[in-house]
Amino acid sequence: MEIKPVEVIDGVPVFKPSMMEFANFQYFIDEITKFGIENGIVKVIPPKEWLELLEGSPPAESLKTIQLDSPIQQQAKRWDKHENGVFSIENEYDNKSYNLTQWKNLAESLDSRISQGDFNDKTLKENCRVDSQQDCYDLAQLQILESDFWKTIAFSKPFYAVDENSSIFPYDLTLWNLNNLPDSINSSNRRLLTGQSKCIFPWHLDEQNKCSINYLHFGAPKQWYSIPSANTDQFLKILSKEPSSNKENCPAFIRHQNIITSPDFLRKNNIKFNRVVQFQHEFIITFPYCMYSGFNYGYNFGESIEFILDQQAVVRKQPLKCGCGNKKEERKSGPFSNLSYDSNESEQRGSITDNDNDLFQKVRSFDELLNHSSQELQNLEDNKNPLFSNINMNRPQSSSLRSTTPNGVNQFLNMNQTTISRISSPLLSRMMDLSNIVEPTLDDPGSKFKRKVLTPQLPQMNIPSNSSNFGTPSLTNTNSLLSNITATSTNPSTTTNGSQNHNNVNANGINTSAAASINNNISSTNNSANNSSSNNNVSTVPSSMMHSSTLNGTSGLGGDNDDNMLALSLATLANSATASPRLTLPPLSSPMNPNGHTSYNGNMMNNNSGNGSNGSNSYSNGVTTAAATTTSAPHNLSIVSPNPTYSPNPLSLYLTNSKNPLNSGLAPLSPSTSNIPFLKRNNVVTLNISREASKSPISSFVNDYRSPLGVSNPLMYSSTINDYSNGTGIRQNSNNINPLDAGPSFSPLHKKPKILNGNDNSNLDSNNFDYSFTGNKQESNPSILNNNTNNNDNYRTSSMNNNGNNYQAHSSKFGENEVIMSDHGKIYICRECNRQFSSGHHLTRHKKSVHSGEKPHSCPRCGKRFKRRDHVLQHLNKKIPCTQEMENTKLAES
């Protein structure tokens, strides 16, 4: 059934479809397209059945959601001094935000008679009804208003605004709901449009096969002007002749949408145009390559959306693309920005040179680097190197911890295959990706980056656990160590101390021939390492950190590859456990000293209570030295070194246990297959940013790990989940756990221990303080202090004397119900007035100034007392004489 217009008003077809014709959106658009392309725009009056579906619309709930941000004030200016009927529109943005009621008051240029408190449903409905408008529009009056508009266009500054997040259509409306068109309709750029009287929408020129639907919900009518697509080129040619068209700078000046012309100008230049008035509850549909403009007769509210026309009705004309910064289309977001037809597109694509393709590949490769994980890029690298495709197939970093649900929970608890991924931050994760794939170098000044080549992993050097002497070779004797390692890795058997070892294998199946060849070198340098000064850096260099050229003897220690400090530092910050409180750290049972003691200035202190590190270090005068061991070393200690022994991964700063590295209970390592060669030198200093002091107890994981750099600061809390520090996965003394077992430093109600300077060594009852909760306050319980100190039902801390500093725990000034933990941190609540504060300082000040009867501040003149100091200043600044001055004045008068 063919759909025809019921009438044509000033060249614009007007359709009044039946409900059956109107119900099929796609069919109706296909039928009226031929009329729209010929005339530019059409007017559609919906049937009464559809209007009945809008009964009671718009609802008050939808009107409340409308928020008009940064409306635009328009100013029309003539192109030249002559009255030629061509105007340019300048926009000025307002930084204010309005709701619908405030916007109507602004539109009427009246005082804000409706306050924010009157923003209720009744007020909204009254301001959105058409019969509440003061003017009743008829054709005769509209002609007078149109003539008045063009006479005063240069003297008015109307506002208009756009809301792209709201819609007034009922959500359950399925027919012609611009907020919910059928999925088969490719639509975009839906928005609410509202404007004041004489608000202007300049000449628009839509792209090929793009249409727009405009619906007027309520308010004053709109005046529309349109130029059919057949006359668009003529109109653009005439406008380009105007001196102010700025065609020399931008041939597509019409795309700026800042030009409007009067009907007299169009008649004078013999340009065919159409005109129509849009009333409320009517649709205006524009078609491709036609031009349209208009203005508002008063305050109104409409909604519009763009959609793609059927390809069979495409107009084979495409407007020019604007390339300057004033192009308005570039600021629009939608799926149709690249769907326009260009006749020269195939020729332009055919003229692309090979150099352009190479440049595109380079940009694409770098874009992939920034938008893909290091695992994906490493897989690409493995595929490019088939010789090493079978090496390290079970990559531990393949299970990324970036998701909220970790992969392989059992494996994570066993600390076998999980590595520290990129929990720190997205920025540090990208830094880690760059450090894994791109190696910065200073050798070639012409290129800032160079690709890395995978090198096979060299065997690790392992020290047998039954060795009697332990030490660390200094960097001055590393060349001999490197030569021994090279000989060990290349020869199946090695002669040590005049005897030949044929692939010696210990009970664990680990080849110890390399360790045996190194044992003498370590023993010879052990005493010198223990007695060295702080100027001698003591470290161990694993074989995986040595470059192939160094191992082959072509270059000494620190060859061409020690310039990659930037990549190492960035990856270290991204993977270091000390850089994020949420990451697991090395276990409390540090291999530094397994005896469970820590030495401070020669004083041994037992930390078996769980609050200190189970490991031990010896510190003398601030200089760290290797702990000298006696006849035999424990079985769980392989290397004793004051500095952390590097793992085979050069990007890790954790201690390694060479006896059983897979089941040692250490913290997960950062990507263990990284192949960045790095040699540690005396004159190289790496930056380590630690947030150990700010470790949040809420973000603590299953295990309590500590960085090897923070052994001197024992943990003041114990995990409340499980304790795996003993390697068994079973918490000791689990029957003594109580809800307050976290300790004072763990609880958010306690502050950090206060440091008291001086040599005050006086402590109460063996430096133990016990606290019990009574209501909302923490009070010291003398009876508990005199009882057994092993009572686990109360808080207990210890005071440590270290270099004259006493660490003493003290109670918080806030009650338990005054501090609430939320997702954003602590919230302090005043229990008297229920006000919330972001810090304890504000809560304390609020209590003193509002709820406290104390008045500590007094006026220096009259002695009047006030609660706050600023109240005294306000009192003094007032030109009111003080009490004492008034008394002196009365005495003088008498």
Curated annotation (Swiss-Prot):
GO MF term set: DNA-binding transcription repressor activity, RNA polymerase II-specific; histone H3K36 demethylase activity; histone H3K9 demethylase activity; RNA polymerase II cis-regulatory region sequence-specific DNA binding; zinc ion binding
Q: Where is the composition biased (Polar residues)?
A: 335-354, 769-785, 795-810
- In the UniProt record, which is one GO cellular component term? cytosol
Name the coiled-coil region(s): 90-110, 361-385
- Please tell me whether the keyword Zinc is annotated for this protein: yes
Q: Does the keyword Repressor apply?
A: yes
- Family matches, as PROSITE patterns: JMJC, JMJN, ZINC_FINGER_C2H2_1, ZINC_FINGER_C2H2_2
Q: What induces it?
A: Induced upon nutrient starvation.
GO terms under biological process: chromatin remodeling; negative regulation of transcription by RNA polymerase II; positive regulation of transcription by RNA polymerase II; regulation of gene expression; regulation of phospholipid biosynthetic process
**Cross-referenced InterPro entries:** JmjC_dom, JmjN, Znf_C2H2_sf, Znf_C2H2_type
Location relative to the cell = Nucleus
Task: Report the residue ranges where the short sequence motif Bipartite nuclear localization signal is annotated in this entry.
Answer: 316-332
Give the UniProt keywords, A-Z.
Answer: Activator, Coiled coil, DNA-binding, Metal-binding, Nucleus, Phosphoprotein, Repeat, Repressor, Transcription, Transcription regulation, Zinc, Zinc-finger
ZnF C2H2-type residues are 828-851, 857-882
Bias category Low complexity: which stretches? 521-554, 756-768
**Residue ranges occupied by any JmjC domain in the UniProt entry:** 170-324
Q: Which residues form the signal peptide?
A: none
> Which stretches of sequence are listed as region Disordered?
324-355, 521-558, 756-810
Q: What does this protein do?
A: Transcription factor involved in the regulation of gene expression upon nutrient starvation. Recognizes and binds to the post-diauxic-shift element 5'-T[AT]AGGGAT-3' in the promoter region. Can act as a transcriptional activator (e.g. of stress genes like SSA3, HSP12 and HSP26) as well as a repressor (e.g. of pyrophosphate phosphatase DPP1). GIS1 also acts as a DNA damage-responsive transcriptional repressor of photolyase PHR1.
Q: What miscellaneous comment appears in this entry? A: Present with 432 molecules/cell in log phase SD medium.
Mind telling me what this protein is named? Answer: Transcriptional activator/repressor GIS1
The organism encoding this protein is: Saccharomyces cerevisiae (strain ATCC 204508 / S288c) (Baker's yeast)
Q: Which gene encodes it?
A: GIS1
